[in-house]
Regions:
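Non-heme di-metal
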Residues: 1-102
Length: 102
């Protein structure tokens, strides 16, 4: 049993991992829309941002794995949090992205 098992720290780490993971997907969707609308530079910014979110998620995931032995059994943890669901045209997606980073 890990020192983190059942702690608020572990819950915060898994929530952060989930948040960064879903943000990555959201930015990837936004990049696709920007591309379809002909905004190549904005598409690239969304892709870069998605890649940053992936790296953030990886840090949280690795930190969890440092403290919990996940090599033998999968650890299933509940995720608690609120995550935005917003998808529009590129202008609105830029606004959604800015609001989501505050």
């Amino acid at each position: 049993m890990s020192k983190l098992q059942g702690t608020k720290t572990l819950q915060n780490l898994i929530n952060a991992f989930a948040g960064e993971s879903q943000a990555r997907n959201r930015y990837t969707y936004y990049a696709s829309i920007a591309s379809k609308e002909g905004y190549k530079q904005i598409e690239e910014i969304f892709i870069d941002t998605a890649n940053n979110e992936k790296e953030h998620a990886k840090l949280f995931f690795k930190k969890i794995a440092e403290y919990i032995d996940v090599t033998k059994d999968a650890l299933v943890l509940p995720v608690t949090g609120s995550y935005p669901v917003a998808l529009g045209d590129t202008l609105n997606n830029l606004k959604f992205a800015a609001a989501g980073e505050n």
